[in-house]
């Protein structure tokens, strides 16, 4: 269900690469890829190296490491960063039909979490990057989205998502909330 459009959009394999909503630099595939679902028939996975990445700290509910300057509607403001130990993987498209020829992901060695993503167009040029921060609940290990920054290097546009998590309702969540029929009927 997309509240801003007031409708449910059923995503199929052909439109998973479309923007989730108009004027966003975010496609369903980018959102879904953060769940780290893989398909070895469609993609080749190669560990490139081990190293470090400068990424937003995972600080739980202490504060938001992204503090954009709202007056300028741009990638300005303050972003706290820290060096994180990572494995770097390349995910190469084998179908020649995926929107990206390659994704390079930095997976945190301690948190097992994707810290940074670079996405390359069909010509091999850097197209988009992904950096995010989550709300972490240390006592349970649960996490929810907090902030996502997705710059489009080619068009010089970006999307910033700021999400307010509601921990009070976590215990009320179950798989029925994600059933397509229930989402379609939810008003």
Map each language-model feature to its residues.
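Active-site environment of non-heme Fe oxygenases that use a 2-His-1-carboxylate facial triad
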Residues: 42-77
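Short, low-complexity, Pro/Ser/Thr/Gly-rich segments in the mature regions of secreted, periplasmic
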Residues: 177-186
């Amino acid at each position: 269900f997309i509240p801003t459009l007031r409708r449910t959009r059923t995503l199929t394999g052909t439109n998973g690469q479309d923007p989730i909503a108009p004027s966003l630099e975010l496609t369903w595939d980018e959102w879904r890829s953060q769940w780290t679902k893989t398909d070895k028939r469609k993609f080749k996975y190669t560990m490139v190296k081990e190293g470090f990445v400068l990424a937003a700290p995972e600080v739980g509910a202490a504060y938001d490491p992204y503090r954009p300057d709202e007056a300028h509607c741009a990638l300005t403001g303050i972003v706290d960063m820290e060096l994180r130990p990572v494995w770097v993987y390349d995910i190469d498209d084998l179908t020649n039909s995926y929107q990206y020829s390659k994704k390079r992901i930095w997976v945190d060695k301690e948190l097992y979490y994707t810290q940074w993503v670079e996405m390359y167009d069909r010509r091999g040029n850097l197209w988009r990057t992904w950096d995010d921060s989550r709300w972490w609940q240390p006592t349970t290990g649960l996490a929810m989205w907090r902030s996502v920054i997705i710059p489009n290097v080619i068009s010089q546009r970006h999307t910033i998502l700021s999400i307010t998590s509601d921990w009070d309702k976590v215990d009320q969540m179950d798989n029925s909330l994600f059933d397509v029929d229930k989402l379609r009927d939810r008003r």
